[in-house]
């Protein structure tokens, strides 16, 4: 977008779907206000209502979350007939809307070409990737998930014809693979499955990936062959940890045994599972982290897990349901408005040191283009996980499809 558009706009709306986007907005807002002090500023998306008070202190006048499209349209209409200074002090648009909407096909005019985004690597070739969503929100209440404070166990569908038309325009633009960005593709399987069946019918060569929680992989195991038959290449699943006690704290709805069963089912179906993890939590012990590394080795998952997944630290944003656990307040510090989270420390200080060391190691070794196996071995040694098996099962990464930008789930 040319900067002159920012200087001349009456309304500037910033999409804040994730933590990183919100932090980037913090760095940008002073420049925006200096360039156009009279514009009406709006923050919308998942992280907007969670940080409502902070955004308003920064100069944002309207904050919209949940199903935000109608609210954005209403705001734009009001501004078209009313000067910014004459708008009501309190916004009439709901802070969080759960309204069922009739969506329009997204207008992607002016966006960068698909080649500018993350690519898919599979079978030694690279494919251009498109993105769409068949639903928003989630039926579940995992305590650590940023979707939950906004949607509170609700999900909303995007109409099938809108999803397919969005895919259609991206295929015309060169997409060879589609990532479905739904928080959980199986929140509504009777909605989701017909979409991928129609996708495969119209574009037999088009592949796709989805995100599905372990609990749904188990409960809807009969649908896994449908995913395979319609060209699903892999499924991302937020496993988070292999420690059952921590899984209980997070209210994930599965156990380590359940994850291992889901992994077995996926492999039997011929589908790749891409698990994501949060290995560093306030409850993580040193032995639990070492066992986590051993399990990745035993389950032959080293090549399926991006190294950064071995270093992720639990994020506690404003509104996190984890803050409802009384024990958390003894572990956290006051809210950090720059980091947009509550800092915390492990009871065993060695874990905090290890987390930092693992993050630095990964950053350094990825710059050196070290393989996942090489990085994993160094993390193993850093954690003093024991003697590394000389006969460790190695799976060639060339056989596992992956996106060039790892998914932080």
Residue positions per predicted region:
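Radical SAM [4Fe-4S] cluster-binding motif and immediate context
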Residues: 112-272
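Acidic, low-complexity intrinsically disordered segments
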Residues: 1-172
């Amino acid at each position: 977008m040319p900067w002159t558009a920012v200087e001349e706009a009456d309304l500037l709306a910033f999409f804040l779907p994730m933590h990183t986007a919100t932090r980037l907005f913090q760095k940008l807002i002073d420049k925006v206000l200096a360039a156009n002090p009279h514009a009406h500023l709006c923050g919308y998306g998942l992280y907007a209502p969670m940080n409502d008070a902070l955004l308003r202190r920064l100069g944002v006048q309207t904050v919209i979350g949940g199903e935000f499209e109608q609210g954005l349209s209403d705001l734009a209409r009001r501004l078209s007939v009313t000067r910014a200074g004459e708008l009501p002090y309190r916004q009439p648009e709901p802070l969080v809307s759960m309204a069922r909407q009739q969506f329009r096909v997204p207008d992607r005019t002016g966006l960068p070409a698909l080649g500018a985004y993350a690519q898919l690597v599979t079978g030694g070739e690279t494919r251009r990737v498109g993105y769409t969503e068949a639903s928003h929100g989630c039926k579940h209440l995992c305590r650590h998930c940023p979707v939950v404070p906004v949607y509170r166990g609700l999900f909303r569908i995007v109409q099938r014809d809108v999803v397919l038309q969005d895919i259609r325009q991206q295929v015309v633009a060169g997409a060879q693979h589609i990532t479905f960005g739904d928080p959980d593709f199986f929140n509504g399987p009777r909605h989701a499955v017909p979409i991928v069946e129609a996708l495969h019918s119209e574009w037999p060569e088009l592949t796709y990936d989805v995100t599905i929680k372990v609990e749904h992989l188990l409960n809807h195991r009969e649908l896994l062959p449908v995913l395979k038959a319609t060209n699903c290449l892999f499924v991302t699943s937020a496993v988070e940890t292999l420690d059952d006690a921590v899984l209980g704290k997070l209210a994930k709805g599965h156990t380590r045994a359940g994850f291992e069963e889901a992994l077995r089912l996926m492999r039997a179906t011929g589908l790749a599972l891409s698990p994501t993890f949060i290995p560093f939590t306030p409850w993580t012990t040193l032995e639990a982290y070492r066992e986590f590394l051993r399990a990745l080795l035993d389950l032959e998952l080293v090549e399926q897990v991006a190294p950064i997944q071995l270093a992720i630290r639990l994020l506690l944003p404003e509104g996190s349901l984890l803050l409802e656990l009384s024990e958390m307040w003894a572990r956290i510090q006051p809210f950090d408005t720059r980091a947009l989270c509550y800092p915390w420390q492990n009871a065993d200080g060695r874990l905090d040191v290890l987390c930092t060391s693992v993050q630095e190691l990964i950053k350094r070794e990825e710059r050196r283009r070290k393989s996942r196996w090489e990085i994993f071995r160094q993390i193993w040694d850093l954690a003093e996980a024991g003697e590394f098996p000389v006969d460790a099962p190695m799976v060639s990464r060339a056989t596992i499809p992956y996106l060039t930008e790892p998914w932080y789930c």
